[in-house]
Amino acid sequence: MIKERKGDLLRSDAAIIAHQVNCQGVMGAGVARQIRHRILTAEQYRAYQQLCRKNKEELLGSCSLMLRMDTGATQYVAHLFAENIPTGRGLDTDYAALRQSLTAMMFLAAQRELSQVAIPGYLGCGLAGGDWETVYSRILMPLFSESCFTLTILYLPDSIRRLWTEFGDIPMNPETECIEQAWHGFSAGTHREEIWHWFEETFQISVAEALMYANNKKKIMR
């Protein structure tokens, strides 16, 4: 099952919070940087770096779990090794490796009898250059839609705006007001109002106030 909502990954109470990492031992930007500074202990970060130094060539497509130490609850951080060398230019995310690392995470979670997983919206699609529609429709949906796991995708306000912009780029029949190609789990032929309602129900916002007008784009929910 896949759920989507507004939220901060680092505040999730899911049993596992997962993010993409590279195989070079660097968490220098994006969600990885936040996790490094706000969640991981210095010892855990050194363990990640050591893992990369010793197993760099074998890490791509794997997953490493670390127990979160800053809360009283039992929660793990999943490092998804889906990026080899971070260049920040073009596509650094390896889609096949991302699928493999998520599959590896599911195996590790099942061993621990854990079923609740959270990821950030646009996983692998920030500086790593991935395409979110590819990640969502070709990787996440096949893996999680019919699985025993509950995957919660948490979007920050900027990511919600980005998703809305991408929806606006989908070809739409001007007469029927239906999208002409599948997008984000919606089949071709879906009326735009159905997708608008999905945005409002999923993210608890008003499309008109928060997304449709340029002068309100920075006003999105607080």
Please identify what each model-predicted range represents.
Residues M1-A118, Y122-R222:
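Macrodomain-like recognition of ADP-ribose-binding/processing modules
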